[in-house]
């Protein structure tokens, strides 16, 4: 069947119910597994094994594919996202691969919208709705336990050597709110902001949430000492239960962990 893919500006020809899926986005991969479609996945990105135990070939990374492996697994659907993956998506589409591009989510609602799109692509909207309901219920339970008043949280995200602050147009904002905190940049109409230490201090955070990756590890406690700040540190990392930048179902675990970290920091 032909489906219009807006990020590509073109129609893509996909089967009614895909049987051989390559997913190049870890959040989408994990969502498919939780929807009951792990057996349909025949290829992954190099980042996906952090979130799923599937024993299938690694077809590529976030920005490239191994063409010989892609030909071997012969997918009838390739899942990819916008942002920096858009160029790869267009290349695969030009080469005739059955690629569908989903938007990078700016919020929790965007994540749920992508899950519904996955359900539509797999011809199983009910599986998508069931996952969303479970996710919403867990988040509602956590948010009901939020401390009063909520502590002010500053989230600093290190993408390798590149540092950003989490604004209001991110699902990290939603994660902080669900876990019981208040994002100090939640009123800013942007996603990721350039580092502005003076503005951070003006907004007077109580908790310092830092995410970094093993290739360039950054410790919250070290930054506090370096900057002379006095606030409670919370250290996030790439493990599914502590990963605040991942948009798959293990966000439920990350929200529980962050909720517990916030509670402990307030004692």
Language-model region placement:
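A short, structured surface patch at a secondary-structure boundary
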Residues: 2-5, 19-73, 77-88, 184
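Well-formed, non-transmembrane alpha-helical positions, independent of function
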Residues: 31, 69-72, 91, 175, ...
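Extracytoplasmic substrate-binding proteins
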Residues: 1-4, 10-14, 20, 87-161, ...
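Proline-aspartate-enriched helix->loop->beta-strand connector
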Residues: 18, 64-83, 97, 194-213
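Short, structured coil segments at secondary-structure junctions
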Residues: 37, 54-55, 95-97, 179, ...
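Alpha-helical, coiled-coil/dimerization segments enriched in small aliphatic residues
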Residues: 47, 165-191
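Short, aromatic/basic amphipathic alpha-helical patches
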Residues: 88-94, 218-230
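Short, charged, surface-exposed secondary-structure boundary motifs
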Residues: 51-57, 69, 109-114, 219-220, ...
């Amino acid at each position: 069947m032909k489906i219009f893919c807006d990020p590509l500006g073109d129609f893509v020809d996909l089967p009614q119910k895909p049987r051989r899926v390559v997913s190049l986005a870890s959040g989408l991969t994990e969502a498919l597994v939780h929807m009951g479609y792990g057996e349909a996945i025949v290829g992954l990105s190099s980042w996906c094994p952090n979130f799923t135990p599937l024993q299938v070939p690694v077809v590529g990374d976030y920005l490239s594919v191994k063409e010989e492996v892609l030909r071997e697994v012969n997918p009838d659907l390739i899942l990819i996202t916008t942002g920096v993956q858009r160029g790869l998506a267009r290349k695969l589409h030009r080469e005739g691969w059955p690629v569908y591009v989903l938007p990078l989510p700016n919020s929790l609602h965007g994540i749920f919208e992508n899950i519904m799109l996955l359900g539509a692509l797999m011809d199983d909207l009910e599986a998508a709705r069931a996952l969303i309901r479970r996710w919403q219920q867990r988040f509602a339970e956590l948010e009901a336990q939020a401390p009063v008043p909520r502590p002010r949280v500053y989230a600093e995200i290190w993408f390798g050597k590149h540092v950003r602050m989490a604004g209001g147009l991110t699902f990290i904002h939603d994660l902080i709110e669900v876990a019981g905190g208040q994002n100090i940049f939640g009123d800013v109409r942007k996603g990721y902001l350039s580092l502005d230490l003076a503005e951070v201090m003006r907004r007077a955070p109580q908790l310092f949430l830092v995410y970094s990756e093993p290739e360039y590890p950054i410790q919250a406690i070290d930054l506090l000492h370096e900057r002379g700040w006095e606030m409670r540190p919370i250290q996030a990392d790439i493990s599914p239960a502590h990963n605040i930048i991942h948009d798959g179902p293990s966000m439920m675990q990350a929200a529980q962990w962050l909720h517990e970290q916030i509670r402990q920091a307030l004692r």
